[in-house]
């Protein structure tokens, strides 16, 4: 076996998994309309998004610990097989409770990113790990761009079609893993430890670190604000602009591409010229302005130029992450990244519930209030930024 084949297989697994997730994004509200009253679609959509994120948050450390104990391959294969069956069940869900159970199972089986990351760490040397983790992120990003486009095209025929396609992709993933994916964890198997199963344990180390805690609060708020389009883009596009599933899929892909390009090509030059602190502030201003403009947009075409502004707002998060990384020693970088990942998962739980509730409460008067609320949340960053940026982080951030 060629030494790079396991890497290619695991990266393909990550990409196909992301495509499967993205496939159902444009059509989930349409599927809900077949099961609940139209006035209840927004509330159930938000709960389903939050439920999926909650299961990922709770189960990611569990799957990671199980892979340490029993190996990466069996955990991945069981998850992929479960996902294939789950998507097939959701495609034919006759009742709402079946769809809820399906999203719970999808969240559990979808929490395999930690296992895939551990697999890559097993098969690569230290000097190559950063590059290969970059490949992993790129493959996931590709899947999340391609998935909504394909899902939107399929959704034009039936809201059930993308679910069947996602089931088929996970089935293909499972078969590929069975025949081509060897076990990577061949060292000593670690016993299960209770603390390894606790997703909240990653926050304890930061207690008493004033600057880090302040900047992590900013990180949480920014990630929470980022949940506005994640929770509302599909429903808002349908209600305000009367988009169909195909248009929604294209818009999601366009947004993903623009956001990725902005982070890859703009963040570095802007941070180098203005400093990380100003890049962070510029990103928040661009994002908040985009939200306000989108709230008042009256035609579907207006959303596409506004996307450029929203994508430019994406430069703020990498700048903040760089500032945070400067505040901790090398031996704590892993803990920092784990804490940031946990915070991201928490916002994926809270955000959909919060913003779909605001949207549902205001839809009969004006459905732009949720975007205004998201922009207003950036104001909560100001006290934490004042404490974090001007008490030591600011001097480092502009170096």
Curated annotation (Swiss-Prot):
Record-level GO cellular component terms: plasma membrane
Domain of life: Bacteria
Localisation per UniProt entry: Cell inner membrane
Membrane topology: Multi-pass membrane protein
GO molecular function: antiporter activity; xenobiotic transmembrane transporter activity
GO BP: any one term: response to antibiotic
Pfam families: MFS_1 (PF07690)
Record's keyword terms, sorted: Antibiotic resistance, Antiport, Cell inner membrane, Cell membrane, Hydrogen ion transport, Ion transport, Membrane, Plasmid, Transmembrane, Transmembrane helix, Transport, Transposable element
Keyword Cell inner membrane: yes
Protein transport is among the record's keywords: no
UniProt record similarity statement: Belongs to the major facilitator superfamily. TCR/Tet family.
Described function: Resistance to tetracycline by an active tetracycline efflux. This is an energy-dependent process that decreases the accumulation of the antibiotic in whole cells. This protein functions as a metal-tetracycline/H(+) antiporter.
Protein name: Tetracycline resistance protein, class A
Gene that this polypeptide is encoded by: tetA
